[in-house]
């Protein structure tokens, strides 16, 4: 059964007699989550899970069951469920969801596990992960947002889904309004040259953004 007690079909077990190594046919649980081996000889048997369903975690434990003449034996085993990880992306100022953001999910050994893109609700889900520590980082953000969100580490546990939240600010805009100093009427076709300067580098990096002209009134 699953960790929440619901029957779990589709799980395959291997039964072997320990005394002489006799192996019986592998059998798979049905819709009610059960398997029955009949007509067995008394003795001690090894029971081991061979495979499980995709959204659960394989149990590698080898269980021993002793059978006695005239007595049936029952063993109840559980599989933990794989956790899901949902990533949420929102506007840092308005809280509105931000679709179209690409996130990279990496495992503990830094190998890439998944690459997902947020949908219209600003979220993306990576399903059926193994328990462990994962790094979630932004790979790209849609315009007009800045890629300023730091990577986050998240620990996943069996039977527990997790959510992780990211926020981004929009790129700032500059509006220049040119007007007559006396009448305050707007002045058309005035040209301005704009340069961007960084305050995050020792050299004060500068970038020429170009020349812009005021629109018609």
Where do the model's predicted regions map?
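Solvent-exposed loop/turn and edge beta-strand elements of beta-rich ligand-binding domains
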Residues: 1-217
